[in-house]
Amino acid sequence: MANPTHLGFQDAMSPLMEELLYFHDHTLMILFLISSLVFYMIFALLFPKLYYPNTSDVQEVEVIWTVLPAIVLISIALPSLRTLYLMDETNNPCLTIKVTGHQWYWSYEYTDFSTLEFDSYMIPTQDLPQGHFRLLEVDHRMITPTNSTIRVLITAEDVLHSWAIPSIGTKMDAVPGRLNQVMITLANPGVFYGQCSEICGANHSFMPITMETIPLNHFQLWLEDSILS
């Protein structure tokens, strides 16, 4: 997760986030090359070594400044379309979790199991165990298995919310009366933090998201305990 001096993206913890980081670096390199060319041309025009009193039509130059931007746009569009496709791809999810945003907490419903649903509230600072993160810990975490394709259906009960976990490259608006979906696949166990990313009222800053990914055999034990309780 991020630290106070962190200026870049969080470490990628999912294949989707790795793709997003690749696209970011790819686009940033193109932007750097374009900016370098523009600054060079500005510098060359400010301090010209040659002076031409007459201007003439140069067909080759017009072809270059027409074709070159087209090539740049295509080199950005193709990786972008690939990433968008991966974000919307649905491949036989092993588990479906419905997430509902409320003022100001989240509720989770494991739709494959009729009795498994719970609300997730932020733990107040005065009740926070030592070593836990302020404003990020919740009383009930969203539990998911590793190496499994998980479909998350996202909606809201009252106003607009946004379910976002930066380290796995997931951010989706929660809109009342509408179901949006994201796909999550995580290879390694861990705890991942996020927050509501849409201003939703007075306590917008106090509805964190905590997702814990555990091995499949541990997830099965957690399911049994949760359903029986």
UniProtKB/Swiss-Prot annotation:
Its EC number is 7.1.1.9. It catalyses: 4 Fe(II)-[cytochrome c] + O2 + 8 H(+)(in) = 4 Fe(III)-[cytochrome c] + 2 H2O + 4 H(+)(out). GO terms for molecular function: copper ion binding; cytochrome-c oxidase activity. GO terms for cellular component: mitochondrial inner membrane; respiratory chain complex IV. The chain crosses the membrane at residues 15-45, 60-87. Belongs to the cytochrome c oxidase subunit 2 family. The gene is MT-CO2. Binds a dinuclear copper A center per subunit. This is Cytochrome c oxidase subunit 2. InterPro entries: CcO_II (IPR045187), CcO_II-like_C (IPR002429), CcO_II_C (IPR034210), Copper_CuA (IPR001505), Cupredoxin (IPR008972), Cyt_c_oxidase_su2 (IPR014222), Cyt_c_oxidase_su2_TM_dom (IPR011759), Cyt_c_oxidase_su2_TM_sf (IPR036257). It comes from Alligator mississippiensis (American alligator). Keywords: Copper, Electron transport, Magnesium, Membrane, Metal-binding, Mitochondrion, Mitochondrion inner membrane, Respiratory chain, Translocase, Transmembrane, Transmembrane helix, Transport. Residues 1-14, 88-229 are mitochondrial intermembrane. PROSITE patterns: COX2 (PS00078), COX2_CUA (PS50857), COX2_TM (PS50999). Cu cation A2 binds at residues 196, 198, 200, 204. Mg(2+) binds at residue 198. Pfam families: COX2, COX2_TM. Its main location: mitochondrion. Cu cation A1 binds at residues 161, 196, 200, 207. Component of the cytochrome c oxidase (complex IV, CIV), a multisubunit enzyme composed of 14 subunits. The complex is composed of a catalytic core of 3 subunits MT-CO1, MT-CO2 and MT-CO3, encoded in the mitochondrial DNA, and 11 supernumerary subunits COX4I, COX5A, COX5B, COX6A, COX6B, COX6C, COX7A, COX7B, COX7C, COX8 and NDUFA4, which are encoded in the nuclear genome.
